[in-house]
């Protein structure tokens, strides 16, 4: 599956510890190799938001938007702060 990331996501990623960055890179590779949603580990849809998903990476959550063809990776934050700002209102 194809994906794009936002400038905010890349900026947040650079602020994370190195071991978490490596795990997130592995998740991004998993998304590229996936042929269906079921192939992407730890991905769940957000309740009440049809096109928004999250992926768990230890204590962090990645926010994704599915436009029908591609994923847009919009956000990454700690679990506690992630749900305060994602999905965008």
Regions found by a protein language model. Name each.
Residues 27-30, 79:
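Conserved short hydrophobic interaction patches
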Residues 29-54:
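A short, surface-exposed loop/turn module that caps and links secondary-structure elements
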Residues 40, 57-61, 65-89:
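Enriched for short, Lys/Arg-rich terminal
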